[in-house]
Amino acid sequence: MRFTLYATLPYQMSIQKTEVLVLNKWDFRETSIIVNFYSRDFGKMSGILKGIKTEPAKFASTLELFSHNDIVFYKKINSALHLVSQCDIKDNFNMIRQSISKVGVASLMMELIDEIMPQEDKNEEVFDLATTVLRELAITDNPDKIMTIFKIKMLAFSGFKPHFDSCVSCGARINGHSKFSFALGGLLCSGCYHKDLKSRTIFRGTVASVLHIEKNDFKVNLNLGMNPQIKKELNIILNAFLNFHLEKELKSQKVLNKLDNFAPALR
């Protein structure tokens, strides 16, 4: 007679290991914390670290925001909250933490991932992009450009991107002037301007920059030249697009807007 063992672990849990970035965390009762991670192998996920506040030596990481870690966890089958048993730091990005503007950019990256990416939906492109951008952010002198590139690439990889390669309404190829519709999520050709009377004119150079960034690798995009006019318009359109579709302004974006190098461009 053959028997099948279904639950050798409590609550039908399996032991898993993965790389993660810390999106956010909060206290749970007096001894534990709950952390939202973005992982390479499982996408966005939540884990509880029991006893970390009373016995911090149990874990080899303090799980700072946007830090890169290896974790071992018990994956629960019928719950979205998993039990983390081991956590080892890979990179705390200390160089980023020495600059308030860079901390703001890294925080916005994590908040954007948390808002856009669905729970436990694997997307290695987003994970690899985020870790690459954090490493570059640590050494760059141009964090605002890196943030712009990240937003465009992130939206493209997530499937949440605005439509820049043709008219979002009729599908026609756009060769001349166009407008951008936040409500429809993309460009409108001159024949479709009436579809959204609140759409705004957009420079051809801005459209070309977005398409270049979507098409090319992050490292290649670092060499892309953007004049102040295009950079200004990109910030306006990307931020307004996110605000419209998320129905709020991200908290980290509000902080960045208060810093001189990230002041919101005026229309």
Task: Specify the residue positions occupied by each region the protein language model found.
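Short polybasic linear motifs
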Residues: 1-4
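Non-catalytic alpha-helical scaffolds and adjoining flexible linkers that form interface surfaces
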Residues: 10-267
